[in-house]
């Protein structure tokens, strides 16, 4: 990035970085057509992804790439720190569409170590408009305060909060009516909690006990059609 005081250089830089995307797009199209001439015809015909991926907006964690999947194979929702508030219209709309219309078989909540959103939530300071969003993660800390405070190493505590934030987001997904009702009727979707490691590119499966969590949640949040 040029010196901001050199406006002409900044303008040229912005034009170049913008135009580069279209060059890359044309190269990508050529590559896809070369491998499969019908790729875009099939893409335009519709989507039937097996997976709903709920992840962090961090640019280093591209959902399709880390899962080894192509366009049309995963439905994606991303936000800061992969939080799933049940009052967030965006998250709830995505889950309802993915489960109710696309009939996804798996819902993955994927966090990542060294998450800036989780790190910010660990900082006891006023972060303005981010405060209500980060409150969700701070509440995760509050719920698991005893476990987290017992971890002496700051890095290990940070990593564990990343994992617990994923687990609590999975709980939020499981609380939704559309997930409970679809699972009762069809046996899917299954909810999974993963963490991506930026240092080696590997995914860690937290192996959440989906049936156990569902049974525990339904003691209070039983939203299946036969529960009334």
Curated annotation (Swiss-Prot):
Zinc in keyword set: yes
GO molecular function, a single term: carbonate dehydratase activity
Cofactor: Zn(2+)
GO CC term, one of those recorded: cytoplasm
Keywords: Lyase, Metal-binding, Stress response, Zinc
Conditions for induction: Down-regulated when grown with elevated levels of potassium chloride.
Database matches in PROSITE patterns: PROK_CO2_ANHYDRASE_1
SMART domains per the UniProt record, alphabetical: Pro_CA
Reaction(s) catalysed by this chain's protein: hydrogencarbonate + H(+) = CO2 + H2O
Enzymatic class: lyase
Binding-site list for Zn(2+): 56, 58, 112, 115
InterPro entries: Carbonic_anhydrase (IPR001765), Carbonic_anhydrase_CS (IPR015892), Carbonic_anhydrase_sf (IPR036874)
EC number: 4.2.1.1
SUPFAM superfamilies: beta-carbonic anhydrase, cab
Cofactor details (free text): Binds 1 zinc ion per subunit.
GO biological process, one term: carbon utilization
Keyword flag Lyase: yes
Family designation: Belongs to the beta-class carbonic anhydrase family.
Function: Catalyzes the reversible hydration of CO(2) to H(2)CO(3). The main role may be to provide inorganic carbon for the bicarbonate-dependent carboxylation reactions catalyzed by pyruvate carboxylase, acetyl-CoA carboxylase and carbamoyl-phosphate synthetase. Involved in osmoadaptation.
UniProt-recorded name of the protein: Carbonic anhydrase
């Amino acid at each position: 990035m040029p010196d901001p005081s050199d406006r002409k250089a900044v303008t040229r830089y912005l034009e170049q970085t913008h135009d580069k995307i279209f060059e890359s797009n044309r190269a990508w199209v050529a590559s896809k057509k070369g491998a499969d001439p019908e790729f875009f015809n099939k893409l335009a015909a519709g989507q039937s992804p097996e997976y709903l991926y709920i992840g962090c907006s961090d640019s280093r964690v591209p959902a399709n790439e880390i899962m080894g999947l192509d366009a049309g194979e995963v439905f994606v929702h991303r936000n800061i720190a992969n939080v799933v508030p049940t009052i967030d219209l965006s998250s709830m709309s995505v889950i309802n569409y993915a489960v109710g219309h696309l009939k996804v078989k798996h819902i993955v909540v994927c966090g990542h170590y060294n998450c800036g959103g989780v790190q910010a939530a660990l900082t006891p300071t006023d972060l303005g408009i981010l405060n209500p969003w980060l409150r969700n993660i701070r509440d995760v800390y509050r719920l698991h305060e005893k476990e987290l405070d017992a971890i002496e190493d700051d890095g290990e505590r940070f990593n564990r909060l990343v994992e617990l934030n994923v687990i609590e987001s999975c709980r939020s997904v499981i609380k939704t009516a559309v997930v409970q009702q679809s699972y009762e009727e069809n046996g899917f979707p299954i909810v999974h909690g993963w963490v991506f490691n930026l240092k080696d590119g590997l995914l860690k499966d937290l192996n959440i006990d989906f049936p156990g969590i569902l049974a525990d949640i339904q003691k209070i949040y039983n939203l299946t059609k036969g529960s009334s």
